[in-house]
Amino acid sequence: MVKCTYGYDFNIDVEDLSLKADHVFEYLRPYNCIYLDSGRSCIKILCQLFAGRELLVPAFSCFSVIYGFTEGVKPVFYNVHEDLTIDFEDLEKKITAATAGIYVTNYFGHMISEEDAERLAGLKAQYGLIVVEDNTQSVFSGDLKIGDYAVASIRKWFPVPDGGVIYSKNSLATLDIRGLRRESKQIRKLYPQIMKSMLLREVIDFPAAQIAEMFAEVERELDAYSDNGEIFLMNEFTEFIYRCNSVGDMIKKRQENEKYLRACLNSPYLRPVLPKLNEGECPFNLPMYCTCRDQMRDYLVETCSIYPSVLWRTHRYDPVNGIGNIAEMGRQIMSFPIDQRYDKEDMDFLAEAINEFRL
């Protein structure tokens, strides 16, 4: 019987579903918001702002960003340094008369610096550009730094089946969402999410691999309908589950776990991707460069039921793997789970397993 798994998909425990005051809708109340089924859908809607023009996009991005633009938007990829800061020399030389905007990613809970935000503001004013912040990994790290609009796949933060948001201090009235329905197939993720809770509580004896395959099947469905251009509003039951999750408690637990695990790691194969988070920033997970990433990950999965995330395999993405050091970043970066499911004892277990690994 599986006692616990670390990382991978969230489980939903129905006994925890009680309404909270500080849910995500309250957190984002200062903004105008459109809630959709996924971050991919949000990107497709935002493409209306850049139809037929070029959008500068960071080369270190996920598959859904690199290949996700529609409406005739042409992504032009700019380099990102190993510390995930913008390569402004590369960015500026790629601005042309066809450029409509800049897409900026705040990685792993770390917001861009004030200096970089000011530099982007200068480019925005000089060329009349629209700036979009991708805050999928940093939505709970504070206010927008420079973006006219922001996008976030908030489903990655909580035990929910779906959810993405476009948010802005500007009006969103120009974005056309007429005819969108609340019929996302992502609601089917509830089945494996609840079964995983039952498995972890030892209520059922069911092959963990089959539950993992159920999660994978839902993601394949998302891939299929997203590729077909289908977009859905957030499911109503998903809204209820979001209202049962405290943002404040989530932020506090992630901050504690990230700080503790970072201090405990001493593997000779690892080095931090980012410096320590600034005051008030909320970590998505703990990213590390690993000189033997795939070997360590295989060991952790097979021996300890630890599932580190690989964000992202950019060495496999043809549009970006020839830019700067993006390919090598895709081969080495691995992210360890520090989310609100876990406590200090769990971080001790992770640290011991990671530190004990040897080639």
Task: Annotate each PLM feature.
Residues 75-76, 131, 308:
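Hydrophobic beta-strand scaffold residues
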Residues 67, 84-90, 159-165, 318-321:
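Short, charged, surface-exposed secondary-structure boundary motifs
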Residues 7-11, 23-24, 30-34, 61, ...:
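PLP-dependent aminotransferase class I/II
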Residues 105, 132-133:
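Hydrophobic residues in beta-strands of the RecA-like P-loop NTPase core, especially within AAA+ ATPase
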Residues 133-167:
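Conserved active-site segment immediately N-terminal to the catalytic lysine
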Residues 101, 130, 149:
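Short, Asp-centered acidic motifs that coordinate Mg2+ and/or phosphate
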Residues 10-29, 44-126, 138:
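PLP-dependent aminotransferase-like
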Residues 157, 171-175, 343:
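Short helix-loop capping/hinge motifs at secondary-structure junctions, enriched
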